[in-house]
């Protein structure tokens, strides 16, 4: 099936844009949602996470203690690689399954770290980047998550640069001070293009 890889930095509006495509019939496969599912109580990744990191990283309800894990992997690259070695194969298997079962005319992989992960770029026929200025990202995440400016800047520093994302893009949606109608118009135009690409690829 024809596949779009949708990405963007934290606070760019990826989820909003993905939902607009979903409302138009695209089949969404969201790696963040899958990551949350496999680290929820009884999730597929939890036994291996507990074995690798200890019971202290499991919350009382049996889910991953996200705040504790976030603190660890932010300062420990080896711990991040250990976590990714557990979660990435499971996320890959789940995304493959969801893509195979997708009923829509095309599938849209929603992948925050698509540019940083070469295999996601290879799995997508086109890469769509949701773009906005860094200052807009910072303001949105501070407002949405209650993070300090320093916390948001640290997250952004761990992600691909805005320039690297734009260089990887086949298509770009600008979501800065865009009105909802203007954003929807950008989505409508690309959705029609993607329907054409998907039909030609069948």
UniProtKB/Swiss-Prot annotation:
Coiled-coil region list: none
Claim: ATP-binding is one of the keywords in the record: yes
Principal place of residence: cytoplasm
GO function terms (MF aspect): ATP binding; dephospho-CoA kinase activity
CDD domains for this protein: DPCK (cd02022)
UniProt record similarity statement: Belongs to the CoaE family.
Purpose of the protein: Catalyzes the phosphorylation of the 3'-hydroxyl group of dephosphocoenzyme A to form coenzyme A.
Protein name in the entry: Dephospho-CoA kinase
Name of the gene this protein is made from: coaE
